[in-house]
Protein backbone atom coordinates (compact mmCIF):
# COMPACT_ATOMS: atom_id res chain seq x y z
CA UNK A 1 0.00 0.00 0.00
CA UNK A 2 1.31 3.44 -0.93
CA UNK A 3 2.19 5.85 1.89
CA UNK A 4 0.21 8.45 -0.04
CA UNK A 5 -2.90 6.29 -0.26
CA UNK A 6 -6.13 8.21 0.29
CA UNK A 7 -7.56 7.49 3.76
CA UNK A 8 -11.25 6.57 3.67
CA UNK A 9 -13.83 5.98 6.37
CA UNK A 10 -16.66 3.57 5.53
CA UNK A 11 -20.00 4.29 7.20
CA UNK A 12 -22.47 1.43 7.29
CA UNK A 13 -19.49 -0.92 7.29
CA UNK A 14 -21.51 -4.10 7.86
CA UNK A 15 -24.14 -3.37 5.20
CA UNK A 16 -24.16 -4.68 1.63
CA UNK A 17 -22.39 -1.65 0.18
CA UNK A 18 -20.20 -1.14 3.24
CA UNK A 19 -18.73 -4.63 3.00
CA UNK A 20 -18.17 -4.20 -0.72
CA UNK A 21 -16.43 -0.85 -0.20
CA UNK A 22 -14.15 -2.33 2.46
CA UNK A 23 -13.24 -5.23 0.18
CA UNK A 24 -12.54 -2.93 -2.78
CA UNK A 25 -10.48 -0.51 -0.68
CA UNK A 26 -8.36 -3.38 0.61
CA UNK A 27 -7.47 -4.39 -2.96
CA UNK A 28 -6.78 -0.85 -4.22
CA UNK A 29 -3.30 0.49 -3.44
CA UNK A 30 -4.60 4.04 -3.88
CA UNK A 31 -6.87 3.70 -0.84
CA UNK A 32 -6.36 3.04 2.86
CA UNK A 33 -9.19 2.18 5.25
CA UNK A 34 -8.74 4.64 8.11
CA UNK A 35 -12.04 3.96 9.83
CA UNK A 36 -15.23 1.92 9.77
CA UNK A 37 -18.50 2.93 11.42
CA UNK A 38 -21.77 1.16 12.23
CA UNK A 39 -24.88 2.06 14.21
CA UNK A 40 -24.57 1.92 18.00
CA UNK A 41 -25.34 -1.56 19.29
CA UNK A 42 -24.62 -3.31 15.99
CA UNK A 43 -23.03 -6.75 16.30
CA UNK A 44 -20.08 -5.63 14.15
CA UNK A 45 -18.90 -3.04 16.69
CA UNK A 46 -15.40 -3.91 17.91
CA UNK A 47 -14.68 -6.40 15.12
CA UNK A 48 -11.92 -5.93 12.57
CA UNK A 49 -13.36 -4.24 9.47
CA UNK A 50 -11.64 -6.75 7.19
CA UNK A 51 -13.28 -9.62 9.03
CA UNK A 52 -16.67 -7.91 8.72
CA UNK A 53 -16.09 -7.65 4.96
CA UNK A 54 -15.29 -11.36 4.78
CA UNK A 55 -11.56 -11.06 4.13
CA UNK A 56 -8.17 -10.56 5.72
CA UNK A 57 -7.87 -8.24 8.73
CA UNK A 58 -7.40 -4.53 8.01
CA UNK A 59 -6.19 -3.53 11.47
CA UNK A 60 -9.17 -1.20 11.86
CA UNK A 61 -11.93 -1.84 14.38
CA UNK A 62 -15.53 -0.98 13.58
CA UNK A 63 -16.71 1.85 15.83
CA UNK A 64 -20.06 3.52 16.47
CA UNK A 65 -19.07 7.19 16.14
CA UNK A 66 -17.77 8.91 13.01
CA UNK A 67 -16.63 11.86 15.14
CA UNK A 68 -14.05 9.61 16.81
CA UNK A 69 -12.19 8.90 13.57
CA UNK A 70 -13.07 11.68 11.09
CA UNK A 71 -10.18 13.91 9.97
CA UNK A 72 -9.85 16.65 7.34
CA UNK A 73 -7.54 14.61 5.11
CA UNK A 74 -10.03 11.74 4.83
CA UNK A 75 -12.97 10.95 2.58
CA UNK A 76 -16.11 9.60 4.22
CA UNK A 77 -17.97 6.96 2.17
CA UNK A 78 -21.61 6.83 3.21
CA UNK A 79 -24.22 4.39 1.88
CA UNK A 80 -26.44 4.21 4.96
CA UNK A 81 -29.87 5.75 5.67
CA UNK A 82 -31.11 9.36 5.41
CA UNK A 83 -30.90 10.33 9.09
CA UNK A 84 -27.50 8.69 9.55
CA UNK A 85 -26.18 10.23 6.34
CA UNK A 86 -27.12 13.73 7.48
CA UNK A 87 -25.49 13.17 10.87
CA UNK A 88 -22.31 11.97 9.16
CA UNK A 89 -22.40 14.85 6.65
CA UNK A 90 -22.58 17.38 9.49
CA UNK A 91 -19.48 15.90 11.09
CA UNK A 92 -17.58 15.70 7.79
CA UNK A 93 -18.45 19.30 6.92
CA UNK A 94 -17.34 20.47 10.36
CA UNK A 95 -14.02 18.59 10.10
CA UNK A 96 -13.42 19.44 6.43
CA UNK A 97 -13.43 15.80 5.31
CA UNK A 98 -14.56 14.83 1.82
CA UNK A 99 -17.89 13.08 1.31
CA UNK A 100 -19.07 10.43 -1.13
CA UNK A 101 -22.76 9.70 -0.56
CA UNK A 102 -24.88 7.08 -2.28
CA UNK A 103 -27.74 7.01 0.21
CA UNK A 104 -31.25 7.13 -1.27
CA UNK A 105 -34.64 7.89 0.23
CA UNK A 106 -33.89 11.45 1.39
CA UNK A 107 -36.94 13.71 1.48
CA UNK A 108 -36.97 17.29 0.20
CA UNK A 109 -35.90 18.85 3.49
CA UNK A 110 -33.07 16.36 3.95
CA UNK A 111 -31.84 16.98 0.41
CA UNK A 112 -31.79 20.73 1.01
CA UNK A 113 -29.81 20.33 4.22
CA UNK A 114 -27.38 17.99 2.49
CA UNK A 115 -26.90 20.51 -0.33
CA UNK A 116 -26.05 23.20 2.24
CA UNK A 117 -23.55 20.91 3.96
CA UNK A 118 -22.04 19.90 0.61
CA UNK A 119 -21.26 23.55 -0.07
CA UNK A 120 -18.90 23.49 2.91
CA UNK A 121 -16.71 20.56 1.84
CA UNK A 122 -15.85 18.53 -1.26
CA UNK A 123 -18.80 16.26 -1.92
CA UNK A 124 -20.11 13.71 -4.41
CA UNK A 125 -23.79 12.83 -3.96
CA UNK A 126 -25.37 10.45 -6.46
CA UNK A 127 -28.20 7.93 -6.06
CA UNK A 128 -26.41 5.65 -8.53
CA UNK A 129 -22.67 5.60 -9.21
CA UNK A 130 -22.68 3.47 -12.35
CA UNK A 131 -21.55 4.77 -15.74
CA UNK A 132 -24.53 3.06 -17.36
CA UNK A 133 -27.09 4.96 -15.30
CA UNK A 134 -25.26 8.24 -15.92
CA UNK A 135 -25.50 7.59 -19.67
CA UNK A 136 -29.15 6.52 -19.32
CA UNK A 137 -30.00 9.75 -17.50
CA UNK A 138 -28.48 11.82 -20.31
CA UNK A 139 -30.36 9.80 -22.94
CA UNK A 140 -33.64 10.19 -21.06
CA UNK A 141 -33.08 13.94 -20.83
CA UNK A 142 -32.39 14.08 -24.58
CA UNK A 143 -35.51 12.05 -25.39
CA UNK A 144 -37.66 14.25 -23.17
CA UNK A 145 -36.42 17.35 -25.01
CA UNK A 146 -36.91 15.88 -28.48
CA UNK A 147 -40.35 14.37 -27.88
CA UNK A 148 -43.14 16.90 -27.44
CA UNK A 149 -45.35 17.07 -24.37
CA UNK A 150 -47.92 14.72 -25.93
CA UNK A 151 -45.52 11.86 -25.09
CA UNK A 152 -46.32 10.92 -21.52
CA UNK A 153 -43.48 9.63 -19.34
CA UNK A 154 -43.46 6.75 -16.88
CA UNK A 155 -40.53 5.30 -14.90
CA UNK A 156 -40.53 1.68 -13.69
CA UNK A 157 -37.86 0.22 -11.41
CA UNK A 158 -37.24 -3.29 -10.06
CA UNK A 159 -34.99 -4.08 -7.09
CA UNK A 160 -34.32 -6.96 -4.68
CA UNK A 161 -36.75 -7.56 -1.82
CA UNK A 162 -34.29 -6.25 0.80
CA UNK A 163 -34.15 -2.69 -0.57
CA UNK A 164 -35.55 -0.39 2.09
CA UNK A 165 -36.69 2.69 0.15
CA UNK A 166 -39.14 3.04 -2.72
CA UNK A 167 -39.10 4.28 -5.34
CA UNK A 168 -35.36 4.04 -5.86
CA UNK A 169 -33.19 7.13 -5.91
CA UNK A 170 -32.25 6.30 -9.49
CA UNK A 171 -35.92 6.21 -10.55
CA UNK A 172 -36.47 9.60 -8.95
CA UNK A 173 -33.36 10.96 -10.67
CA UNK A 174 -34.67 9.74 -14.03
CA UNK A 175 -38.01 11.39 -13.32
CA UNK A 176 -36.24 14.63 -12.42
CA UNK A 177 -34.30 14.44 -15.70
CA UNK A 178 -37.58 14.27 -17.65
CA UNK A 179 -39.06 17.16 -15.67
CA UNK A 180 -35.96 19.35 -16.03
CA UNK A 181 -35.80 18.74 -19.79
CA UNK A 182 -39.43 19.85 -20.11
CA UNK A 183 -39.20 22.80 -17.72
CA UNK A 184 -41.50 21.15 -15.18
CA UNK A 185 -41.45 21.16 -11.38
CA UNK A 186 -40.85 17.50 -10.59
CA UNK A 187 -42.27 17.74 -7.06
CA UNK A 188 -45.62 18.84 -8.51
CA UNK A 189 -45.76 16.54 -11.55
CA UNK A 190 -44.56 13.23 -10.10
CA UNK A 191 -47.07 10.48 -9.28
CA UNK A 192 -45.77 7.72 -7.04
CA UNK A 193 -48.88 5.58 -6.78
CA UNK A 194 -52.22 4.98 -8.47
CA UNK A 195 -55.14 3.06 -7.03
CA UNK A 196 -58.87 3.03 -7.59
CA UNK A 197 -60.80 5.44 -9.79
CA UNK A 198 -58.09 8.03 -10.43
CA UNK A 199 -59.56 9.63 -13.55
CA UNK A 200 -57.76 10.63 -16.71
CA UNK A 201 -53.99 10.93 -16.47
CA UNK A 202 -52.78 14.55 -16.61
CA UNK A 203 -50.49 15.14 -19.62
CA UNK A 204 -47.64 16.54 -17.54
CA UNK A 205 -47.71 13.79 -14.93
CA UNK A 206 -44.57 11.67 -14.49
CA UNK A 207 -45.50 8.30 -13.06
CA UNK A 208 -42.97 6.31 -11.04
CA UNK A 209 -43.54 2.70 -10.03
CA UNK A 210 -41.33 0.57 -7.77
CA UNK A 211 -41.28 -3.25 -7.91
CA UNK A 212 -39.62 -5.51 -5.33
CA UNK A 213 -38.84 -9.17 -6.02
CA UNK A 214 -36.08 -11.72 -5.56
CA UNK A 215 -32.46 -10.63 -5.78
CA UNK A 216 -32.70 -8.18 -8.69
CA UNK A 217 -29.80 -5.74 -8.43
CA UNK A 218 -31.67 -2.93 -10.15
CA UNK A 219 -33.53 -2.54 -13.45
CA UNK A 220 -34.83 0.83 -14.63
CA UNK A 221 -37.12 1.52 -17.59
CA UNK A 222 -38.38 4.88 -18.85
CA UNK A 223 -41.45 4.74 -21.10
CA UNK A 224 -42.52 7.55 -23.43
CA UNK A 225 -45.95 6.89 -24.92
PLM features per residue range, with description:
Residues 73:
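An anion/phosphate-binding loop that grips the pyrophosphate of nucleotide cofactors and donors
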Residues 15-16, 83, 130:
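Residue-level detector of alpha-helix initiation sites
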Residues 80-81, 104, 210-212:
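Short glycine-/small-residue-rich Rossmann-like dinucleotide-binding loops
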Residues 111, 120-173:
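Adenosine-phosphate binding glycine-rich loop
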Residues 76-77:
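N-terminal Rossmann-like NAD(P) cofactor-binding module of classical short-chain dehydrogenase/reductase
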Residues 20, 24, 91, 95, ...:
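Alpha-helical structural signal in soluble globular domains
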Residues 4-70, 149-225:
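C-terminal substrate-binding/catalytic lobe of Rossmann-fold NAD(P)-dependent oxidoreductases
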Residues 83-95, 102-125, 134-143:
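Rossmann-fold NAD(P)-binding glycine/threonine-rich loop
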Amino acid sequence: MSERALPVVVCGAAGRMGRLLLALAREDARLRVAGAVEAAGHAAIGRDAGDVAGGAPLGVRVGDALAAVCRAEQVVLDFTAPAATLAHARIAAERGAGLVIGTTGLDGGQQRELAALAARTRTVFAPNMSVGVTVLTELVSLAARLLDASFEAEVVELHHHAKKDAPSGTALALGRAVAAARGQDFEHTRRLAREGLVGERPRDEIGIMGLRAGDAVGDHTVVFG
